[in-house]
Amino acid sequence: MPWIQLRIDTDGPNADAISDQLMEEGSLSITFEDGKDNPIYEPTLGETPLWSHTVIVALFEANFDLTPVVERLKLLPCLGDNFSHKVEQVEDKDWEREWMDNFHPIKFGDRLWICPSWREIPDPTAVNVILDPGLAFGTGTHPTTALCLEWLDGLDYSNKDVIDFGCGSGILAVAALKLGAERVTGIDIDYQAIEASKANAERNGVEDKLALYLPEDQPADLLADILVANILAGPLRELAPLIAEKVKPGGLLALSGLLQEQAEEISAFYSEWFNMDEPAHKDDWSRLTGIRK
């Protein structure tokens, strides 16, 4: 079934009032977009981010008459007679199928491949992680995940235990096991992530070496030779003492999920417990690594 959408240019403070009016007019959904395409990755603590130039996108059924809707919107004081808007036809698509069609096997480092479960494996002799990410974050396509996978590919896992702190889909945990880790512990605040990690471990035949916990259930004495945390700068900052105490002396650390401009601050924060390396970058994102003192 096709749709039509009404796109309205406005400023941030008026977006909610216009959105309410559109819902009363029969809109099926409302989406806010940044009119200047400036992404907000992680707001400052206590800050509510607002775009100064907001595009409101209202979706309607294809046969909906938008002419009277536009006329009534002109009566809103925050819009007026000459407000900027556009009506567009929207093709009906199977978005899940389209996403699957565009997710291909990806190589990381010298030996590691991430392969979606519905694709053929390009190199059967490589280390292949078969992934079905479900609803949890982590497919390898995001720069932070890629940075972590490239780091994991270059490690020696002989008799090593690993912690995946914020395991999401389990992509990093499963990759470490397929690369030779003795045992991996995955921790996440989201039960759905725990289930996705479990399913992906079973798909790769490594479920017997993977322990998964919500934070409140993890063992108090949990320690690892290698810890990777692909979360965000805020949690990395707040949880630094907890993360540090889980790494054995001489153990390895990798942190990602942070922007380039956040890397220096987070690196300095962790230098209390780790000898930190120079950051690695991909696009706007960074990865920090270090060795436990």
Swiss-Prot record:
EC identifiers of the protein:
2.1.1.-
Please tell me where S-adenosyl-L-methionine binds in this chain.
145, 166, 188, 230
Q: What is any one GO biological process for this UniProt entry?
A: methylation
Where mainly found? cytoplasm
Question: By its UniProt entry, which InterPro entries does this protein fall under?
Answer: Ribosomal_L11_MeTrfase_PrmA, Ribosomal_PrmA_MeTrfase, SAM-dependent_MTases_sf
* Subcellular location(s) of the protein: Cytoplasm
**According to the lineage, what is the superkingdom?**
Bacteria
Question: Which CDD domains does UniProt cross-reference here?
Answer: AdoMet_MTases
Q: Give the CC-aspect GO terms.
A: cytosol
Q: Look up keyword Phosphoprotein and say if it applies.
A: no
Query: What is catalysed by this protein?
Result: L-lysyl-[protein] + 3 S-adenosyl-L-methionine = N(6),N(6),N(6)-trimethyl-L-lysyl-[protein] + 3 S-adenosyl-L-homocysteine + 3 H(+)
Keywords of the record, alphabetical order, are: Cytoplasm, Methyltransferase, S-adenosyl-L-methionine, Transferase
Q: Which family does it belong to?
A: Belongs to the methyltransferase superfamily. PrmA family.
Q: What name is this protein filed under? A: Ribosomal protein L11 methyltransferase
Classification of source organism: Bacteria, Pseudomonadati, Pseudomonadota, Gammaproteobacteria, Alteromonadales
Q: What gene codes for this chain? A: prmA
